[in-house]
Amino acid sequence: MESQQLSNYPHISHGSACASVTSKEVHTNQDPLDVSASKIQEYDKASTKANSQQTTTPASSAVPENPHHASPQPASVPPPQNGPYPQQCMMTQNQANPSGWSFYGHPSMIPYTPYQMSPMYFPPGPQSQFPQYPSSVGTPLSTPSPESGNTFTDSSSADSDMTSTKKYVRPPPMLTSPNDFPNWVKTYIKFLQNSNLGGIIPTVNGKPVRQITDDELTFLYNTFQIFAPSQFLPTWVKDILSVDYTDIMKILSKSIEKMQSDTQEANDIVTLANLQYNGSTPADAFETKVTNIIDRLNNNGIHINNKVACQLIMRGLSGEYKFLRYTRHRHLNMTVAELFLDIHAIYEEQQGSRNSKPNYRRNPSDEKNDSRSYTNTTKPKVIARNPQKTNNSKSKTARAHNVSTSNNSPSTDNDSISKSTTEPIQLNNKHDLHLRPGTY
């Protein structure tokens, strides 16, 4: 009968568990079955009133009407969890649903199994709300983008918030090998750029253009772990995630540095294979350029031995340096340092010969003075400097004859030639010569 009375009070619950009632727990002389009809009516009214008002559980300090029995109470149940991780590690609804993301660019739209070490950004709600990815996920980037009829359709608010972002963004392929990570991260960066997140990608100096927001960091983390499973990540990426499993920005920054290093390596190899030297630049500068390239390649894991380096250097030599290809008797065991000793020797010899050439040349001022002291027979005006020149000058033939005979004929002839030309010439008419009238 007492159990029937307790069943009439389902709203009464004190404590954390239902306590059983036995005859040993009742310490009273009053017969528990001896209850008046008026009290039973009061009990019925109280039970009806409690059921109609749907009262909550009273405080633990409340005293039951029957002080001799422990009040039954159901055990407390913790609130349900959205996933296998504590509730304080979950994202808020605002974080999980940022506006403005295009398709494949919404964190709450991506189904995934999170890393075992990363419970922070597990999306709330049942997993059934996330649609499965279409068959294009994990395929090469040349595959056409999925059609809108088979995929999630953005709401009008999401469409209005999108600016330059495409309606459908092609997702990156799935990473399937640690060796493919350098190529995969390039497609992932392209995916972020198409998702209107180019400003958060680190630049050449390792810093992004703008600060990343919490929603963008959530999106970055979720998409990275979806398309790059942890078992296929390189060791250096796992080392970063072991320190901070949300530091995707550091992974991107290191990846960009490696891309630049790879580009520099390719440029160094091309430069080394196309060396050209003919002595137009100092030998020291040429040696510094070549040794820096070789050291940089060796530091990046591309070993260039002496034999290969010497062959590449000698192939680019020209001019006076070209004979080093054939006259060198230590081709097999020659080092880069020994080859540059020969290059320096030729360069110094060239510089010495160039510096000594002006010592053997005549000074232009000396040439002018010498031209005044020597007789030039081709220019009579320069040679004829007779101060006793008369008005009746000799012809060019007579002057030339005088000059030529002045050095060879005896002094008597010179005296006869030096006589005045104004005296008349007497002709001896032995051969009965007749002159024309008026000529004498």
Curated annotation (Swiss-Prot):
It comes from the Eukaryota. GO terms for cellular component: cytoplasm. Residues 153-165, 402-418 have a biased composition (Low complexity). Residues 429-440 have a biased composition (Basic and acidic residues). It is found in: Cytoplasm. One of its GO terms (molecular function) is RNA binding. Residues 1-10, 48-60, 127-152, 419-428 have a biased composition (Polar residues). GO terms for biological process: viral translational frameshifting. Pfam families: TYA. Induction: Ty1-DR1 is a weakly expressed element. Induced under amino acid starvation conditions by GCN4. Its main location: cytoplasm. Residues 299-401 are annotated as: RNA-binding. InterPro entries: TYA. The modification Phosphoserine is found at residue 416. Residues 1-93, 126-173, 352-440 are annotated as: Disordered. The record marks 401-402 as: Cleavage. Homotrimer. The C-terminal RNA-binding region of CA is sufficient for all its nucleocapsid-like chaperone activities. Retrotransposons are mobile genetic entities that are able to replicate via an RNA intermediate and a reverse transcription step. In contrast to retroviruses, retrotransposons are non-infectious, lack an envelope and remain intracellular. Ty1 retrotransposons belong to the copia elements (pseudoviridae). Capsid protein (CA) is the structural component of the virus-like particle (VLP), forming the shell that encapsulates the retrotransposons dimeric RNA genome. The particles are assembled from trimer-clustered units and there are holes in the capsid shells that allow for the diffusion of macromolecules. CA also has nucleocapsid-like chaperone activity, promoting primer tRNA(i)-Met annealing to the multipartite primer-binding site (PBS), dimerization of Ty1 RNA and initiation of reverse transcription. This is Transposon Ty1-DR1 Gag polyprotein. It comes from Saccharomyces cerevisiae (strain ATCC 204508 / S288c).
